[in-house]
Amino acid sequence: MTTDQLPAELERVHMVGIGGAGMSGIARILLDRGGLVSGSDAKESRGIHALRARGAQIRIGHDASSLDLLPGGPTAVITTHAAIPKTNPELVEARRRGIPVILRPAVLAKLMDGRTTLMVTGTHGKTTTTSMLIVALQHCGRDPSFAVGGEMGEAGTNAHHGSGDCFVAEADESDGSLLEYTPDVAVVTNIETDHLDFYGSADAYVAVFDAFVERLAPGGALVVCVDDPGAAALARRTAELGIRVLRYGSGPHGQAPSGEPLAATLVSWQQQGTEAVAQIRLAGEQQHPLVMRLSVPGRHMALNALGALLAAIEIGAPTEAVLDGLAGFEGVRRRFELVGTAGGSAPSSTVRVFDDYAHHPTEIAATLAAVRTLLEQSGGGRSIAVFQPHLYSRTKAFAEEFGHALDAADEVFVLDVYGAREQPLAGVSGASVAEHVSVPVRYLPDFSAAAEQVAAAAAPGDVIVTMGAGDVTLLGPEIVTALRVRANRGAPGALR
């Protein structure tokens, strides 16, 4: 049975860092469920403007007095330990007043109470797979509540309080917070070592997925992509615990590489421009393969969709309706998102600029593979990768792997490291990545000059893709503008 009644401690909350992707989503749901919300953040943003329009009281900057934005003060203060230091004056004041300080994952878990919970995790593809599942269920008339790490194209938001009986959310593995949840269905897209700054070792990182799956509700199921070795190993360990496992992938004859039957098989996949058509087969169905159409390119996207399909079917959604919903999925912001074009109308006479959140070597490889297929189908042109490493610790750990992944482009520009919450590490910079790239590469430590230099390298038919989890996303529009300026003045080197 679902209810809109909020737990007493969440009826009036103050949120420190309210503008972040995860925090703003929680704020939306609390407001939609009748809660009173105040908050603070370091700077204005579109998300903060949207929350104010919904009734949230938000102050820019951090000060102890912000806890008085709500009449009577908050019943709880919500924060995220990854981004907000314990010395934040609002957190210090909350502790002084005896106001409970609750971390975002614990709040999300409380908001899921009473609903069938579907959660997606994995090293890569979490946000896209979660969003695909949401869109599919919406198309089936389920109106799920949801919280996702990126802005969905269809909804224009990252969270929603729905009238349905299910809740779909992304489970972030980066800091172990996924262990707050007890899902009915867990989707694991892949497992590949990451976030060593938090876990310290690959074994510790892998272990958190086992712990998460062991938290499945009684009768729950693991939906897992066994094309990925790490996820396939998790599937075997989970099955040994007696937990139901639904495997998907592209193994021959409907079997995983290790011989287990697949619940869903990607029989074939073909990219058609920026769209794709896949042939899939579900276990126990002997008819011809089903057709799955997608509006997003890349084989990895087809596998993500297959995981979303299985999860939706698991809670009773009709297969054909789910496939129809997936066909209408428009993507997630910053997941191979077309930023703009410059030049003529035909692919051979224009430069297309895309932006992607890829910040791990495997994600870069998948994105550049999609670019390569796009170029092959449009008659040629070159791929130009613009990569901004994210976190000094990750750059140090994967500098060589980043370089090898970027070799799939024809030309590469490497920006300096976006440190986010980390302090610089001696000897670690964008140059650490660039020195491992074997195709033509330039290291651009001056972000302000990058757009013009990238634009100068482009020619008609080329595809430029900016990649990274930092502010490299701001560069795409600047590149498009620079390309158009060069075209209008007939500058050599671009759109010639």
Curated annotation (Swiss-Prot):
EC number(s) given by UniProt: 6.3.2.8
One term under GO cellular component: cytoplasm
NCBIfam families noted in UniProt: murC
PANTHER family in the cross-refs: UDP-N-ACETYLMURAMATE--L-ALANINE LIGASE, UDP-N-ACETYLMURAMATE--L-ALANINE LIGASE-RELATED
Species of provenance: Mycobacterium avium (strain 104)
Pathway field: Cell wall biogenesis; peptidoglycan biosynthesis
HAMAP family associated with the record: MurC
Catalytic activity: UDP-N-acetyl-alpha-D-muramate + L-alanine + ATP = UDP-N-acetyl-alpha-D-muramoyl-L-alanine + ADP + phosphate + H(+)
Main location (coarse class): cytoplasm
Name recorded for this polypeptide: UDP-N-acetylmuramate--L-alanine ligase
Gene expressing this chain: murC
Protein task: Cell wall formation.
